[in-house]
Amino acid sequence: MILTVTLNPSIDISYCLENFNMDTVNRVTDVSKTPGGKGLNVTRVLSQLGDNVVATGLLGGDFGDFIRSGLDALEIRHQFLSIGGETRHCIAVLHEGQQTEILEKGPHITKDEADAFLNHLKLIFDAATIITVSGSLPKGLPSDYYARLISLANHFNKKVVLDCSGEALRSVLKSSAKPTVIKPNLEELTQLIGKPISYSLDELKSTLQQDLFRGIDWVIVSLGARGAFAKHGNHYYQVTIPKIEVINPVGSGDATVAGIASALEHQLDDTNLLKRANVLGMLNAQETLTGHINLTYYQELISQIQVKEV
């Protein structure tokens, strides 16, 4: 079973407008409200793949109940911890081919709630083989909280796929608690290193050889339309993907995480892990809805992905 962790979920609201005018009334022609957050995008894709997945994290208030009901409607199992605060909204205004986002920070998590969630994980870890940890930390949680969570997962011999950035990721990399996989994009990798990084294979290879990444089994760097560059142990791979028509790239990284977790769950080899990860990211980009894939095109696309050891 794959357990997905979303500590700062949201209700994602999309407003579709023909025109977006400031300082006046805008009439919405179409609106959608769905359970959101990076980890729940991962969850939906895994569910669509047919993998055995359970979602966990922190939910509070009526908005938290809305997310539970939304997952129930999709027949996705979940075991969230209830908190005192109200789960947040994230609003996307789609207008004239553009997207304007308004993101709430979310509830403040108390120390008691933070400790309770780690205890909650101890009770549900046994059934899981793979843990995905995605997204930002909500207010109240220290920057080393993911490191504490990963340390707990390691104690239970669980593989962890981590998708976060900034201080939360830096704190993990500096700790003794190492995840199995991290998936930075080139911008996030640049922020970690503190200097610009090009698409040069030699530069990417030397970057991933730095001590900062020691102890991490897989480092998979997303390069957007250029594919990916990956390090697995002492092996390095260049992933080349075909050109596709991109409808909505939001959530493609989450779909990629789902592919990594699924490949680990099914014990795929390096080449097929990288292919599954990348094809799911591409399939998500071809859909209007975030965290959705159309498996009709799976074989057609995956057959065009090239993985080369370098």
UniProtKB/Swiss-Prot annotation:
Which class of enzymes does this protein belong to? transferase
Question: Pfam families per the record?
Answer: PfkB
Pathway connected to this protein: Carbohydrate metabolism; D-tagatose 6-phosphate degradation; D-glyceraldehyde 3-phosphate and glycerone phosphate from D-tagatose 6-phosphate: step 1/2
Please name every pair of cysteines joined by a disulfide bond in this record.
none
- EC number(s): the record gives 2.7.1.144
Give the family, as the similarity comment puts it.
Answer: Belongs to the carbohydrate kinase PfkB family. LacC subfamily.
Q: What is this protein called?
A: Tagatose-6-phosphate kinase
Q: Which organism is it from?
A: Streptococcus agalactiae serotype V (strain ATCC BAA-611 / 2603 V/R)
